[in-house]
């Protein structure tokens, strides 16, 4: 939908191939009965909303000029996922990212110009980059693993049962709050 809103709804998988493109001038919403798999390019000129009972997998590029949200069992990001990306390449501080999953695996780049909130049972951030220009909230019932990963927020709030930040970077431009019930490994972090 080059001039308006695009809504995609499927009982099965929603899949964008490497040469494929799904684009909306304003809001883009994809609802799958199973999984959402992006190996190409997904672009929303407004908000981006992804909802699947299975996995949202991104090995390509996903972006929204406005807010982006993911509700799924798992988010597996090996590509670039950006909330607040403008047509001129700048990042808007109004682009917030909200992720509600059982498991987040990020070996790629997650970026929000504004706030970013992840609510999950477990977060795997190893080898990836996660950047929020505003407040970054990582709220995990289980473990957060950030081996050789890079996490930055204008402020950072992290809650987990354990934290493995071996060789990782956890950086805040302001307040940094870490609430871990169990073990913390910050070797070379």
Where are these regions (language model features)?
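Extracellular beta-strand scaffolds
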Residues: 1-8, 12-23, 27-30, 34-38, ...
């Amino acid at each position: 939908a080059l001039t308006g809103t695009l809504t995609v709804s499927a009982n099965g998988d929603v899949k964008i191939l490497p040469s494929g493109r799904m684009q909306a001038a304003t809001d883009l919403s994809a609802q799958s009965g199973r999984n959402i798999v992006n190996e190409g390019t997904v672009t929303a000129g407004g908000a981006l909303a992804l909802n699947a009972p299975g996995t949202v997998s991104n090995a390509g590029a996903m972006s929204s000029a406005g807010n982006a949200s993911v509700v799924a069992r798992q988010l597996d990001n090996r590509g670039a996922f950006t909330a607040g990306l403008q047509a001129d390449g700048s990042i808007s501080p109004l682009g917030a990212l909200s992720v509600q999953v059982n498991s987040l695996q990020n070996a790629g780049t997650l970026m929000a110009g504004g706030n970013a909130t992840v609510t999950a049972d477990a977060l795997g951030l190893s080898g990836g980059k996660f950047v929020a220009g505003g407040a970054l909230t990582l709220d995990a019932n289980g473990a957060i693993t950030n081996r050789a990963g890079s996490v930055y927020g204008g402020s950072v709030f992290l809650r987990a049962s354990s934290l493995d930040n071996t060789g990782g970077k956890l950086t805040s431009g302001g307040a940094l709050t870490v609430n871990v019930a169990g073990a913390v490994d910050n070797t070379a972090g």
